[in-house]
Amino acid sequence: MKITSNKQPRTPTLFESLLPILSMVILLGGGYAAFDLPPEPLMVISTVIAGLLVKRLGYSYNEILNSISQKIAKTMPALLILISVGLLIGTWMIGGTIPMMVYYGLKMISPAMLYVTALLVTSLVSVCTGTSWGSAGTIGVAFMGVAIGMDANLAATAGAVVAGAYFGDKCSPLSGDTNLAALAAQVDLYEHMWHLLYTTLPSLILSAIVMTVYGFNSGLASDDVPERIILITEGLNNVYHFNPLMLLPVIIVLYGSITKKPTIPIMLVSAVVAMFNAYFIQGFNLHDIIKSAVDGFNVSMIHQEIPAILHNLLNRGGMNSMMGTLLICFCALSFAGTLALSGALEVIVHQLLKLVHSTGTMILATIACGLTMIGVTCNGQISILIPIEMLRNAYIERGLHPKNLSRTVEDSATIFEPILPWTAAGAYMAGTLGVATLSYLPWAVLCWSGIVFATLWGFTGFGIAKLTKQQQSELLAQAEIDTAKN
């Protein structure tokens, strides 16, 4: 039973509506970006501020809790997918699927094709692992070693690695941010991923053209493979037994993506197959296989000496690896649930949409929101959740499918994040690859061209999914039900 307060709730003013969001921006911009404070308590403080506003508007404490609970309950299936992602990475690692991708990817290196190979192989590894940071910190570091050995352009190599890492991340069902964008927009994961290709695939092609042309005109002629690459490939070959069965877990996920099968069951089947590979082909014991699924793979499970460079490559995955992402999600969803009860987002969006007169300007408004959030908060998850929460109903009212929104937010926040020096992603990529963010920025073509293609498609209508009248009516009706429940 819903408990209400005696005071009749009222609609907030524009200033009251902006106050919680501005508070969150200031707290995250100052605390997280400037002083490196963890974002979770800052989001909790932002939620408290939003809660005080909601109380001032006439809502009760129980109504606030009810709104937060409903917001979390609605996203619980996607949160379960995030946990399944950690399970999949851990089992793919111990089963040999990811190591085999890395092994054969590194075997493809050719001097003149160094830059485009770095782009494409990092993309492949990132698709398979679902982590841009992981692929940049492993394969990316390996390619930087190749570039140093060949006396290549380190900024161009780093740009190729970053672009490839983020393409793979956005087009992988294992990616936390991709799952988060789909759940926030209430769009099927695979539908979101396929729709994202309208902007990421042209950006990848453009990146590949730039890297190929530059590679053939850069004077790279050495055919020597640096010792770093030899250590990785020989180390992996000594630890794992590679055969085509290692690809079966990948094929299962790809099949599920193409046929749009339920995400979690497909991931579980893929993980089970990877476990069988780990036991029957790789020779790991059952205890280590289960531990890898829960806590992630660790090189201590390999009972032989391996090169130190493989430690960073192999130590990853597990369901527990997703707990940090889940905590941020819960904090952000608490803020979103509290704010949704106040009606503040409706007030803000109403003012914002006075400037929107076409699909193109709607896309531009979304890009502006995404860039502002990532530029100020420096947090990818928050920069996904808040703009989608603000604009989803506006898209539906204009007959635009919410997957246009989830795609544009990823283009303007997630993919743009690593080319901003003050964000965690920008700092990580610069520190890991040894190249300043602003130096590799021009070469990370995919990261900044996404918003160009998003804007172009918005004004031309290409790749813009429209809702049928029936779909629009159903989604609007569901939105009214959700509002009534709040």
Q: What are these model-predicted stretches?
A:
Residues 58-148, 305-393:
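Membrane-embedded alpha-helical segments and adjacent helix-loop junctions characteristic
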Residues 22-30, 48, 52, 79, ...:
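Generic alpha-helical transmembrane segments of integral inner-membrane proteins
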Residues 2-87, 93-113, 251-331, 486:
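Hydrophobic transmembrane alpha-helices of multi-pass solute/ion transporters
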